[in-house]
Curated annotation (Swiss-Prot):
CDD domains: AdoMet_MTases (cd02440). The lineage of its organism: Bacteria, Pseudomonadati, Pseudomonadota, Gammaproteobacteria, Enterobacterales. PANTHER family: RNA M5U METHYLTRANSFERASE, TRNA (URACIL(54)-C(5))-METHYLTRANSFERASE. It comes from the Bacteria. It catalyses: uridine(747) in 23S rRNA + S-adenosyl-L-methionine = 5-methyluridine(747) in 23S rRNA + S-adenosyl-L-homocysteine + H(+). Pfam families: tRNA_U5-meth_tr. The keyword Oxidoreductase does not apply. Gene3D superfamilies: 2.40.50.1070, Vaccinia Virus protein VP39. [4Fe-4S] cluster binds at C3, C11, C14, C87. The active site is at C334 (nucleophile). This is 23S rRNA (uracil(747)-C(5))-methyltransferase RlmC. Its EC number is 2.1.1.189.
Amino acid sequence: MQCALYDAGRCRSCQWITQSVNEQLSAKTADLHRLLAGLPVEQWCAPTGGPEQHFRNKAKMVVSGSVEKPLFGMLHRDGTPVDLCGCPLYPASFAPVFSALKPFIARAGLTPYNVARKRGELKYLLLTESQFDGGMMLRFVLRSETKLTQLRAALPWLRAQLPQLRVITANIQPVHMAIMEGETEIYLTDQQALAERFNDVPLWIRPQSFFQTNPTVASRLYATARDWVGQLPVRHMWDLFCGVGGFGLHCATPQMQLTGIEIAPEAIACAKQSAAELGLTRLHFQALDSTQFATAQGETPDLVLVNPPRRGIGKPLCDYLAQMAPRFIIYSSCNAQTMAQDIRHLPNYRIQRVQLFDMFPHTAHYEVLTLLCRQ
């Protein structure tokens, strides 16, 4: 992939950009083999890739510069701003949004936050696009509610320019730290969730719910999990760290009992909305800590699917799963190193199959799906 920002030495986020996609995939596959060394694997499935560019559905932009000439992108450690509006990872549909937002910031009087001076209001712009219908969610991350009245007053102009903006919010992040968002979310539109659809499964994206940033590869990941579960005798399933329910909603059947657990209430609201649309009455989603939920249960499902953050599921949950001994475990991970550590804490399970998904091209990161069977 050609990138003017990389060539100019202004951005180094895509550290593997000089390698071909095939070279990247080979290196990631070798890394996964190294991490699982000593753990017998029955079947290595062919890795799955996706588009080389324009694949991201989300932009996280630091806002710097002045209210008359705002700059969207990132800050180097020395405070130097870099404009990332031309990043080739973003779809072409983002460009007109960025263009309209620059004069809008002046209209609304949203002074960009100055990190060195600890002054200003607008810290970040968070933009998400639905692959399903092109609808977008825009979040203004502000230091305080001081400019809310001005922001609301200026919004009709922005919505006339960009009718694709379905969900608009103000997120309040008052702390002088590099934290992307705060706890308070103020909706500025009637619509509060963005509709998405993978493999004919309706999904919803809310402001504070995690959603994969590479929809093409994510849809293939969910479809693969559905295929694997469909080949197993599963009538009762847990989906831990379930997010908006992508895995569980793909894998569930009308006959299956499924419980999805996620600590973020916004994500659970999305999952419940999708389950209702699908008419799946035996799906239950709850906003709880996944480890605390699992260790408090007295019943054993046929299959436990886990999709933890980068830290993995950890030894306490591994120990409990080993003791509870469900027949199958599916582990989806964005950090194969912690996944490999966790699997080594499950000695009574063998790896039936593994598949790598290149969710993050031009970086060393990747997603991996692993099916474990009780011995």
